[in-house]
Amino acid sequence: MDQSANKLALVEPSNFNFNTETFDTNVFQNDVQFNKLKIFEEFDNFISTLDKNKISFNILKSPKNSPDSIYPNNWVVTFEDGTYDLFSMHSPNRRIERSNSNINFLNKNYSLKCDLTKYEAKNIFLEGTGSLVLDRINKTAYMAESNRSNIRLASKWSQLRGYDLVHFKSYIDKKPTYHSNVLMFITDKFAGICFDSISDSKYLLSNIEKTHEILYLSIEQVKNFSGNALLAVSYTHLRAHETGYN
């Protein structure tokens, strides 16, 4: 089992825009004017960086009317055993991202193991590795509770996948943190966490310090998306850290 990703899934930002359906739950979201040319320039630069570091990736098409489609990890998660899981999305326009072409791509490369999409009809949500920060080596899932990260559904998923669930409450600007992966990340050796946003930080620290060296993140750093990080390995087996784009 490895914590690093050996291939990335990227979605071209052709529909990236302000999402009115997620604004109420995302404290980081601001209604600003989007510069499409700048967005594609950054996307192309990122691809060049991946190529330079010999990191493999696939580029998926963005379905129409899907402003957040560049975050596919919220609706689908793949695993080392060649399986994938589909997750329950809070926003209707995020469910569009499960397009036929994207599902066909997944089915050609993986086998579906767990489908949680039926819980959308019950208003019960769990949004992939946005909700769950996975320690794949030690089989532990860390989750900040929110209306987009349901404890019961997370427990059901954890039991199916054989993970231990560690859940906690997190607040930024007096609002629940909508996704766990904005405030913490995990690599094979260390974990970056914003303890200042967590109510019972001692509980989380006692769990994660058993397996990882801790990198402390400030709320200001989290607001600048230092918590969105991923450990990637190149096809020459050299490792690289790239901060998440949000």
Regions found by a protein language model. Give the residues of each.
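Structural signature of eukaryotic scaffold interfaces centered on beta-propeller domains
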Residues: 2, 69-73, 77-78, 126-136, ...
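Short, structured patches in soluble enzyme cores that scaffold and shape functional sites
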Residues: 12, 88, 136, 143-147, ...
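Redox- and metal-dependent alpha/beta enzyme cores, enriched for Fe-S-associated oxidoreductases
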Residues: 153, 166-229
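General small-molecule cofactor/ligand-binding pocket signal
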Residues: 56-61, 113-119, 166-169, 215-217
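Hydrophobic alpha-helical segments and helix pairs
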Residues: 91-150
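N-terminal leader/transition segments
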Residues: 1-61
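Long, hydrophobic/aromatic-enriched structural stretches that serve as scaffold segments
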Residues: 53-93
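Conserved small/polar residues in nucleotide/adenosyl-binding loops
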Residues: 236-243
